[in-house]
Amino acid sequence: MPRPILATVHTAALRHNLDRARRAAVDARVWAVVKANAYGHGIERVYEGLRGADGFALLDLAEAERVRALGWRGPVLLLEGVFDARDLELCSRLDLWHTVHCDEQIDMLAAHKTLKPQRVFLKMNSGMNRLGFAPERFGSAWTRLNALPQVDEISLMTHFSDADGARGIAHQLEVFERATHDLLGERSIANSAATLRHARQTRGDWVRPGIVLYGSAPDFPEHDAAHWQLQPTMTLSTKLIGIQTLKAGDTIGYGSNFTAEGPLTIGVAAVGYADGYPRHCNTGTPVLVNGVRTRMVGRVSMDMITVDLTPVPEAKFGTEVTLWGRSAVSGAVLPIDEVAQAAGTVGYELMCAVAPRVPFAPADGE
């Protein structure tokens, strides 16, 4: 028998979260962002739950080919555009839309021989300072693209750096609108946080929700997933494979960094950092045992963690342990954002970091 660890993908939750994003976006069309292998869930596994979107936005040609292989015939957008001039031929064959964020990509298009003009999203660097044309150069980039026979429609996009925080979007939005007010083209400016927190200000033709589709709050800890009416789409679970009874003064695991203050029963769960569970989690990290919230104690090992069984005295060998997501026993939810906070990171990273050795399965009945 294999180890009892399992990552479960919840298709119904994906549909629910997509609908939540669509309701927030009012009249805009929705790109379902499935980059990074659908935030670690697997593109093939999320397709059924997200096929109600108006398009799929992703990172590279390999992911685009997988979406097309699933039968999707609608829009597909390469969020970073092409990395090599040879990629443009495949863009033509797969009928892809792609981002243009630098002069080199315009040069590639200008030299490309194609019978079918391509749809592009021209990206502005409105203040995030990653990809995109500076505002003062955006108009000239648009003019150059518009003159190319290789280019069909030009849409306009930017990306917010602080839509999830106190700084907000006002400055970047002003920069974008000032530089694009006289340019034709559909607009796409709202990511997950902007879609939920700034829907009125960021109404455009397209929104680009990512993390909210997977049930994580884009502005945690200010708001949790329940506040935004999001449901977890991934559950990482395992089982207890051992029980130990400690007395006062006993220590646990490598480094002996946890010492029992009195009699304590602990459970050993089959999960560790080799499975993608973050090693930076330490004593106090929340877990569910038999659907009841308790805490991890000691350090994360390669293949095991130890948990405090005080709240669940009935726990035994084989009892369910939920690392994040929804307990199959009680239905209780342990938000991935809480676990990420304990590890000093974000839910995005935990989803993407689930190791290849962890098997995936759809939720029962899905």
From Swiss-Prot:
Pathway: Amino-acid biosynthesis; D-alanine biosynthesis; D-alanine from L-alanine: step 1/1
Positions bound to substrate: R130, M302
InterPro entries named among the record's database cross-references: Ala_racemase (IPR000821), Ala_racemase/Decarboxylase_C (IPR009006), Ala_racemase_C (IPR011079), Ala_racemase_N (IPR001608), Ala_racemase_pyridoxalP-BS (IPR020622), PLP-binding_barrel (IPR029066)
One CC-aspect GO term: cytosol
E.C. designation(s): 5.1.1.1
Cofactor(s) the protein needs: pyridoxal 5'-phosphate
Gene Ontology molecular-function annotations: alanine racemase activity; pyridoxal phosphate binding
Stated family: Belongs to the alanine racemase family.
Pfam families: Ala_racemase_C, Ala_racemase_N
Catalytic activity, reaction form: L-alanine = D-alanine
Assigned keywords, A-Z: Isomerase, Pyridoxal phosphate
Alphabetical list of PROSITE patterns matching this protein: ALANINE_RACEMASE (PS00395)
Active site: K35, Y254
One of the GO biological process terms: D-alanine biosynthetic process
SMART domains, sorted: Ala_racemase_C
HAMAP family the UniProt entry points to: Ala_racemase (MF_01201)
Record protein name field: Alanine racemase
